Regions:
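Chalcogenol-based redox active-site neighborhoods
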Residues: 1-156
Length: 156
């Protein structure tokens, strides 16, 4: 990944999934407070669905203790897929899903790859942001160990 700890997060347009699907600049949502952003290859994929996303749901209380104001999950998917995925977990306010529809954000941080020739995906990563500055960044080397919430929390 070309983004590093200490860098300011680049701005890109994504679709935020709240009450409605709304296009928004990442600077408006990720440049405030202390937040976690984790990226993953795709909604409904086995590791993302069985390990990565659930790890952040299970760690909600620990995240609050670390003064994390919000958790965001981003993937190169369309907003309808991300919305269905979020509803399948009944996320409520625990995790805000972001659809990086064309992969512009993912490309801007150098996290893109083409998985099995099936198209643009995001590498798996987790980062801690404070007012838009990357304070901690972990890129996954395996399936989902380093970037799972429990392991990431040990590093911050």
């Amino acid at each position: 990944m070309k983004i590093k700890e200490g860098d300011k997060l680049p701005d890109a347009t994504v679709v935020i999934l709240e009450k409605e699907h709304t296009e928004i600049n990442t600077s408006k949502i990720l440049n405030k407070d202390k937040v976690i952003l984790f990226g993953l290859p795709g909604a409904f994929t086995p590791t993302c669905s069985n390990k990565h996303l659930p790890s952040f749901l299970k760690s909600a209380e620990e995240l609050k203790k670390k003064d994390i104001k919000k958790v965001f999950c981003i993937s190169v998917n369309d907003p309808f897929v991300m919305d269905a995925w979020g509803r399948s977990y009944n996320l409520k306010d625990q995790i805000t899903l972001l659809a990086d529809v064309n992969g512009n954000f993912t490309k801007s941080i150098g996290a893109e790859f083409n998985w099995r020739g099936w198209g643009l995906r995001s590498k798996r990563y987790t980062m801690l942001l404070e007012n838009g500055i990357v304070k901690k960044l972990v890129e996954e080397e395996g399936k989902c160990e380093l970037t799972a919430a429990d392991n990431f929390l040990k590093k911050i």
